[in-house]
Amino acid sequence: MNKYNIYVDHTLLKADASLEEIHKLCEEAEENEFYSVCINPCFVKVAKHYLLETSVKICTVIGFPLGANTIETKVFETKNAIDLGADEIDMVININQLINGNREYCLNEINQIKEVCGDKILKVIVETAFLNREQKEFAAKIILESNADFIKTSTGFAKEGAKLEDIILWKRILGDVKQIKASGGIKNFEDFKSFIEAGATRIGTSSAIKILNNH
């Protein structure tokens, strides 16, 4: 096994993903010993069936991709996803509240969802494409203060994805207290490796097979 495979959340979040593609994603994750598959909630149950006797985790997304659902809706989505078999939750923060510096709202949202997660991993997507440097620092400090496990760069649906400078910034703020997931537009091994070296402990990509088999 490639030593980098364990960092991978093998991702398929496109709106027109087919059941056959989900099955293939799961097979690839098992064969390559990726950490998880990251899929939309409607596929969690079937992916759990495919991966039942493997070590591959099931990761799904909440409030995706805009983050604009109410807290109550996100809490329900989270509980439902876990009931269906999700091991990890990648939630999109309320981006408007984050941009406007509403610390109390952001913390309340994250912590309510983490309460439902229990011992399941919670990653918080802050969609860096919409944030300036000061807002990225604020986002990291929110995560540091919250009960979340990870901060995550992007949904993959915005105009920009992961940037090395953001991983470096967050690692400086978070240290080893919280983890970092880089995602969005990661298509080559050089970027993949540089994100890990900068402090990311998980990489979300739909191109993992190409990236890791060709380096």
UniProtKB/Swiss-Prot annotation:
Record CDD domains: DeoC (cd00959)
UniProt subcellular location: Cytoplasm
GO CC terms of this entry: cytoplasm
Assigned keywords, A-Z: Cytoplasm, Lyase, Schiff base
Catalytic activity: 2-deoxy-D-ribose 5-phosphate = D-glyceraldehyde 3-phosphate + acetaldehyde
Protein name (record): Deoxyribose-phosphate aldolase
Alphabetized GO MF terms: deoxyribose-phosphate aldolase activity
GO biological process, one term: 2-deoxyribose 1-phosphate catabolic process
Any matching Pfam family: DeoC
Main function: Catalyzes a reversible aldol reaction between acetaldehyde and D-glyceraldehyde 3-phosphate to generate 2-deoxy-D-ribose 5-phosphate.
Root EC class: lyase
InterPro entries: Aldolase_TIM, DeoC, DeoC/FbaB/LacD_aldolase, DeoC_typeI
